[in-house]
């Protein structure tokens, strides 16, 4: 028996909407990353993008446990000497909560071209409104 390899025509993509209100960031990220990869489907293949689209709403209401809000930092390097920039999650959640949630989820995807392709299927919004009502997204509960 040969291994089944899904073709582009075989992949049926669905849209899910996830409410991040009072959900721990790590638990939210693992569930969403799993759906983006397609691990919930029987046709999952590690070397193909078979995942679904995910919309995360209320990104500003996500929870961080412990002292992560004050102590955890998001860093990036500008490329110049002394150009290591860092921002605490407390400041980041006030300034740009979408970036904090996106960074956590994309960090759990593969770090290659396939992971970048999967990350394009993620939409994160501040507040309960989103622009994807026409896609009829299913509500996904994360506890």
From Swiss-Prot:
Annotated GO MF terms: mRNA binding; structural constituent of ribosome
This entry carries the following GO cellular component terms, namely: cytosolic large ribosomal subunit
What InterPro entries does the record tag this protein with? Answer: Ribosomal_uL13, Ribosomal_uL13_bac-type, Ribosomal_uL13_CS, Ribosomal_uL13_sf
Sorted keywords for this record are: Ribonucleoprotein, Ribosomal protein
The record, for SUPFAM superfamilies, names: Ribosomal protein L13
Task: Please give one Pfam family short name.
Answer: Ribosomal_L13
Origin: domain of life: Bacteria
Family label: Belongs to the universal ribosomal protein uL13 family.
Its biological purpose = This protein is one of the early assembly proteins of the 50S ribosomal subunit, although it is not seen to bind rRNA by itself. It is important during the early stages of 50S assembly.
Describe, as the record does, how this protein assembles with itself and its partners.
Answer: Part of the 50S ribosomal subunit.
| Protein name from the UniProt record | Large ribosomal subunit protein uL13
Q: Which organism is it from?
A: Finegoldia magna (strain ATCC 29328 / DSM 20472 / WAL 2508)
Phylogenetic lineage? Bacteria, Bacillati, Bacillota, Tissierellia, Tissierellales
